[in-house]
Amino acid sequence: MNKIIIFCSILIFSLFVITGGEPQKESAEDLSIPAGIGFDIEKAGANTILYKVSISSYIFQEKKTMSRVNSGIQKSIGQTRQNRQLKIDKKFLVGLEKVDIISEEQAKEGIRNILDILFNNPSANDTALVAVCKGNAKDILEYSIEGYPSSSDYIEGMIKSSKTFNFFTDNYKTIDVFVRLDSEGRNFTLPYLVMTDEGPKIDGVALFKDDKMIGKIGIQETKILNMLSTGSGKGIITIQQNSKEYIDYYAKCKRKVKCTRENGEYTFHISLKLKGEVIANELDKKVSEDEEERSKLEKEMSEKVEEACNKFLEIMQEDYKSDFLELGRVAAAKYGRDTGIDWNEALANSNITVKAEVKIEKQGRGDY
């Protein structure tokens, strides 16, 4: 018996050494490596939807890397893979895509099926960035940008760097959307892309309730939403009299929320603290010299932020009747989860107050 065990052990070890100790891997040239994925739909009738999934794949050449877009069209997202494989000369490799771009039409139908098929595959890239686009996602994937092997590479960088301005967050990864989708008291937003004469551009954010897109807001409202919802980004606030007289203030925002409940009604107190520097002053030169003038400017900017926040809250509560600020999550953490409360409805009828505090820490290098 011992001889048999020893013989089998030697045989297994020999096979392990002969095969190199691991399964044979395929070379990159034999694989279709994705740069980005685009999700579109086509209406084939009153109750029939055709899913169109496009893959932007790298083409490796001796001196440069390019990309090519192939699409699959079928009645289910899974079937599009089979349809697409009939048109490409390499095996498709899942898990390296940089961006997932969803057309507005698909987003309005719902994106749960997209997330399901992505996360059912253990090789899927859960850190790929997600965005919604106007028009067809395939058109954006096919757009050529000088200096980049694919438009997906450019869009990835564009979304990542967006957090340096407009108070954008970095919570646009696939895993971020997946986590928020079924979390109590949480909705999510995604960057909204449009095509311009200069190429793709972030034009605001798409608003989601559950897994469906219910609206879109422009970049100015997006700045306010970002401050109110995450309070972790950076952006510019401007006090302006006319085209020649203005002050630009570049600041980092931090948010704190307090929640109270009385007779079943919720009240939320949002505190925004902005700290930063004046990067352009064409309005009041006394600000850099006079403490009283600086305090006056800080108060004026605080009031401007509060006014803009209150306008957005009115739109959120009356027009969308949804919670894009994750206030329901705050209330659920304090008063209990799984109580059956519809936090979107509760927030639409809640009292929400905003207090902004602006602090000027620096004023550039001075005047010359």
Question: Which ranges hold each PLM region?
Answer:
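Membrane-proximal alpha-helical signals and transmembrane carboxylates
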Residues: 2-368
